[in-house]
A protein has these predicted regions:
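Conserved PLP-enzyme active-site core in the AAT-like
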Residues: 2, 8-17, 79-311
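N-terminal "arm"/small-domain region of PLP-dependent enzymes with the aminotransferase-like
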Residues: 2-60, 68
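A generic secondary-structure signal marking the coil-to-beta-strand transition
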Residues: 8, 24-28, 51, 78, ...
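Glycine-rich beta-alpha junction loops
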Residues: 16, 30-36, 225-226, 288-290, ...
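Short Gly/Pro-enriched turn/cap motifs at secondary-structure boundaries
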Residues: 18-20, 210, 273, 334-336, ...
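Conserved N-terminal alpha-helix of the aminotransferase class I/II PLP-enzyme fold
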Residues: 38-90, 112-120
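Conserved C-terminal alpha-helix-loop-beta "cap" of PLP-dependent enzymes
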Residues: 295, 303, 310, 314-378
Length: 378
């Protein structure tokens, strides 16, 4: 694949690169196993001495092609797909954290992520301190501890629609020798590429805009390849010291910039197994092929709806960074000048019953537990 292609081209062309006589459309490789002619070749695959496929719980050609497409869209060195966005955020953090470690995260994140970091990971011995992302750098810095391993935030928060100051968060993270992980689900790489602003690792719930049709659940983790794990090797022993389960292999030494992704695949996916089905990845790829077109229209639609709601006296407040009087307008213009996403947060004048009456009166707009697909929902 040529370098410096437009993101619209990458949506269609990246990932699956058919050879002479191969299917033009990404095929669904619906197989758990892969045949080899001799045991030596299989042994080399098991020991990570050769690239290839041997069991779909780790890697599969369909999944791999879609992961490569998402990595290309974000401008990363590699990616791994997961069975959900929740799995992606868990794996992204757990790949570099263990019992006794600490993370710092924005408190403006998806509720499921808040519970994952604040409740579930605590049971695994990983503590989290949540911070106000709009606070000054000194206040956020105060949350860091000697055992802090990650700083986490969302480009556009779910559901509050706050915009993260990625450059500020990157400065703080790197000052403390840790990576910045950003969930880029709402913005997508069409509207924002966090790596261009200092972020190190990006996650996605591909269930949302990337799929775009509410047809599959999935997630993705993309590594920029820019974070120097060995500069603070004592913080990241899982990456920078030998892995006994692979005969003393060291991920950063053996795989270089791909060390983080290789550990995700070879160790965590091997042991925890949150892999998407090849069929789900095929559906995701179909959605990605039109992502650049859909995001343009989503943003146009959302802008018009936000302006309508903003001017309606029955509406108490609207959060959408495309509005000039929105608190995050300047950050939105900085990081997403062509539009943020199609999600709007707003409140009505009245009480809970007012909100219920409004929702129950909707005709074309559906009440669902979802956001960010082709059909307007609430």
């Amino acid at each position: 694949m040529k370098k410096n292609l437009k993101r619209s081209t990458l949506c269609v062309q990246a990932g699956w690169e058919p050879k002479n006589g191969d299917p033009r459309v990404l095929p669904i490789i619906q197989s758990t196993t892969f045949k080899y002619d001799n045991s030596e070749e299989m042994a080399m695959l098991f020991d990570l001495k050769k690239e290839g496929y041997f069991y779909t719980r780790l890697q599969n050609p369909t999944n791999d092609a879609v992961a490569k497409k998402i990595a290309a869209l974000e401008g990363g060195v590699g990616a791994m797909l997961t069975s959900s966005g929740q799995a992606a955020n868990f794996y992204a953090v757990f790949n570099i954290c263990e019992a006794g470690d600490h993370i710092v995260a924005s408190n403006e994140v998806y509720g499921g992520t808040y519970n994952l970091f604040g409740v579930t990971m605590k049971k695994l011995g990983i503590e989290c301190t949540f911070v106000n992302p709009d606070a000054d750098e000194e206040e956020i810095q105060a949350a860091f501890k000697p055992n802090t391993k990650v700083l986490f935030g969302e480009t556009v928060s779910n559901p509050g629609c706050n915009v993260l100051d990625i450059e500020k968060f990157a400065r703080i993270a790197h000052k403390n020798g840790v990576p910045l992980i950003v969930d880029n689900t709402f913005a997508t790489p069409i509207n924002c590429r966090p790596f261009e602003w200092g972020c190190d690792i990006v996650t996605h719930s591909t269930t949302k805009y990337m799929d775009g049709h509410a047809s599959q659940i999935g997630g993705a983790i993309v590594d920029s390849g820019n974070f120097d794990w060995n500069a603070n090797a004592e913080k990241f022993p899982g990456l920078c010291t030998p892995d006994d389960s692979y005969h003393g292999l060291t991920y950063t030494k053996t795989f270089g910039k791909m060390g983080y992704i290789q550990k995700l695949v070879a160790q965590l996916m091997r042991d925890l197994g949150s892999i998407p089905s090849p069929h789900n990845s095929f559906l995701l790829n179909m959605g990605l092929e039109t992502l650049h077109l859909r995001m343009q229209q989503h943003c146009k639609n959302a802008q018009r709806v936000a302006e309508f709601l903003h001017d309606d006296p029955r509406v108490a407040w609207v959060h959408f960074c495309g509005l000039k009087d929105d608190k995050f307008y300047s950050l939105g213009q900085k990081y997403m000048p062509n539009g943020s996403c199609g999600v709007i947060a707003f409140g009505l004048n009245g009480d809970r019953d007012t909100a219920i009456k409004f929702m129950d009166s909707l005709e074309m707009i559906a009440i669902v537990t979802h956001v960010a697909d082709a059909r307007t929902c609430v």
